[in-house]
């Protein structure tokens, strides 16, 4: 599909090196009852963006319903934004495990914030497992057809998906198993 969009339809873009190609921008239901499960993901940031995604799961597909994407804000400033934007406090919010104090602040505010368990593995192996899951690679022997649907209002998520690529070896021109 990416090659057709670029070479067939004449759209701008680069096919090579994209980490995820199984996503599309689409108007999707914002009714949480339309999904089998709802989760919230949060990647803490300050200089880099603090990103919160409201996700729906249905039939093995991921639906990115809403995003909060802010820079240079303390947790105490972000919590009211999440409440104002209707992020459901009673759904599990999976958070970056490196920031237990921030998780505690969310819990104190009434959110079901939990640290993501990175198990006892290297950061690279953990990241690789996350990418495999997003692609639909459940195990070495089981792959499912998974599509990630992104609501058009999630402009920062769309931008990140368009820019998330594998590192390219400058000498050989080959892509490495290392996200950038």
Regions found by a protein language model. Give the residues of each.
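Proline-rich low-complexity regions
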Residues: 21, 179-180
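ATPase catalytic-site recognition across NTP-hydrolyzing enzymes
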Residues: 1-42
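Acidic, glycine-rich loop-and-beta core segments that form the ion-binding/anion-interacting portion
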Residues: 31-65
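Mg2+-dependent endonuclease catalytic cores in nucleic-acid-processing enzymes, primarily RNase H-like
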Residues: 51, 56-178
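Short, solvent-exposed loop/turn segments at secondary-structure junctions
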Residues: 13, 46-47, 100-101
